[in-house]
């Protein structure tokens, strides 16, 4: 859950987001070391009075500054590719949910169930109950079972949208005429918020997403009550 003046990422809710957080820290450490080295070299050049006017080339130095950046790029690329393939891999999902973007709301269809569909609109500020979040609450939450692999099929009925849940490391474009998919699995129960992350018109800011992750027994009771 985000909070005011937050500096870091949201707490990870899914295994994918945990991997992305580790990769972020790994990359940031490399960037910090490179920046420190560059600043040290610049400060040394500005403060020293020694010069090398007779130096025309330095093969050893040129070899080092060619090989070293290549090794650094490999250190960044390998974990990045691993996470990329993890995000794209969907093996035997326990549940499939199809979500369609509209101007300016989301509709959901649980394809494993017959006639389990609904639209999800933002609750206007004047209708909020005490404790509810402004611009983030919806009239129909997406209830899903926790600790189970879920496949999300994402598309759009009109213009470009983007279905994003930051705490789960999810951001998938909703493109008219194209069906994109994403893997979702929560390691803990709770409410998780997201928003449309593609400018889609005048009410783009009013397309929140709310996932309610619950134990399997509660999900079965909820789905049975709607059928």
Curated annotation (Swiss-Prot):
Q: Give ranges for the Mitochondrial intermembrane compartment.
A: 1-14, 88-227
Under SUPFAM superfamilies, the record lists: Cupredoxins (SSF49503), Cytochrome c oxidase subunit II-like, transmembrane region (SSF81464)
What gene is it encoded by? MT-CO2
Cofactor(s), names only, from the UniProt record? Cu cation
Q: What class of enzyme is it?
A: translocase
Q: According to the UniProt topology, which residue ranges lie Mitochondrial matrix?
A: 46-59
| Classification via InterPro entries | CcO_II (IPR045187), CcO_II-like_C (IPR002429), CcO_II_C (IPR034210), Copper_CuA (IPR001505), Cupredoxin (IPR008972), Cyt_c_oxidase_su2 (IPR014222), Cyt_c_oxidase_su2_TM_dom (IPR011759), Cyt_c_oxidase_su2_TM_sf (IPR036257)
Sites where the protein binds Cu cation A1? 161, 196, 200, 207
Q: How does it sit in the membrane?
A: Multi-pass membrane protein
Q: What organism is this sequence from?
A: Dugong dugon
Q: What does this protein do?
A: Component of the cytochrome c oxidase, the last enzyme in the mitochondrial electron transport chain which drives oxidative phosphorylation. The respiratory chain contains 3 multisubunit complexes succinate dehydrogenase (complex II, CII), ubiquinol-cytochrome c oxidoreductase (cytochrome b-c1 complex, complex III, CIII) and cytochrome c oxidase (complex IV, CIV), that cooperate to transfer electrons derived from NADH and succinate to molecular oxygen, creating an electrochemical gradient over the inner membrane that drives transmembrane transport and the ATP synthase.
What the entry lists under PANTHER family is as follows: CYTOCHROME C OXIDASE SUBUNIT 2, CYTOCHROME C OXIDASE, SUBUNIT II
Give compartment(s).
Mitochondrion inner membrane
Q: How does it assemble?
A: Component of the cytochrome c oxidase (complex IV, CIV), a multisubunit enzyme composed of 14 subunits. The complex is composed of a catalytic core of 3 subunits MT-CO1, MT-CO2 and MT-CO3, encoded in the mitochondrial DNA, and 11 supernumerary subunits COX4I, COX5A, COX5B, COX6A, COX6B, COX6C, COX7A, COX7B, COX7C, COX8 and NDUFA4, which are encoded in the nuclear genome.
**What biological-process GO terms show up in the record?**
ATP synthesis coupled electron transport
Report whether Transmembrane helix shows up as a keyword of the record.
yes
On whether Transcription is a keyword of this UniProt record, the answer is no
Catalysis performed (reactions):
4 Fe(II)-[cytochrome c] + O2 + 8 H(+)(in) = 4 Fe(III)-[cytochrome c] + 2 H2O + 4 H(+)(out)
Protein name per Swiss-Prot or TrEMBL = Cytochrome c oxidase subunit 2
Q: Which residues bind Cu cation A2?
A: 196, 198, 200, 204
Q: Where is the signal peptide?
A: none
């Amino acid at each position: 859950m985000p909070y005011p003046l937050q500096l870091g990422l949201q707490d990870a809710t899914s295994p994918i987001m945990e991997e992305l957080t580790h990769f972020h820290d790994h990359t940031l450490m490399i960037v910090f070391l490179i920046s420190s080295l560059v600043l040290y070299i610049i400060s040394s050049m500005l403060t020293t009075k020694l010069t090398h006017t007779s130096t025309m080339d330095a093969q050893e130095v040129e070899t080092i500054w060619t090989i070293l950046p290549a090794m650094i790029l490999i250190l960044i690329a390998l974990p990045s590719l691993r996470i990329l393939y993890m995000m794209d891999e969907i093996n035997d999902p326990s549940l499939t949910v199809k979500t369609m973007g509209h101007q300016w709301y989301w509709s959901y269809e649980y394809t494993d169930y017959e006639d389990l569909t609904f639209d999800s609109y933002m609750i206007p500020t004047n209708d909020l109950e005490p404790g509810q979040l402004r611009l983030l609450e919806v009239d129909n939450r997406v209830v899903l079972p926790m600790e189970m692999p879920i496949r999300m099929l994402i598309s759009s009925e009109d213009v470009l949208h983007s279905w994003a849940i930051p705490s789960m490391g999810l951001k998938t474009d909703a493109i008219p005429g194209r069906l994109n998919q994403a893997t979702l699995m929560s390691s803990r129960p709770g409410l998780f918020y997201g928003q449309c992350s593609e400018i889609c018109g005048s009410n783009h800011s009013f397309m929140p997403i709310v996932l309610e992750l619950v134990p399997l027994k509660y999900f079965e009771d909820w789905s049975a009550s709607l059928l």
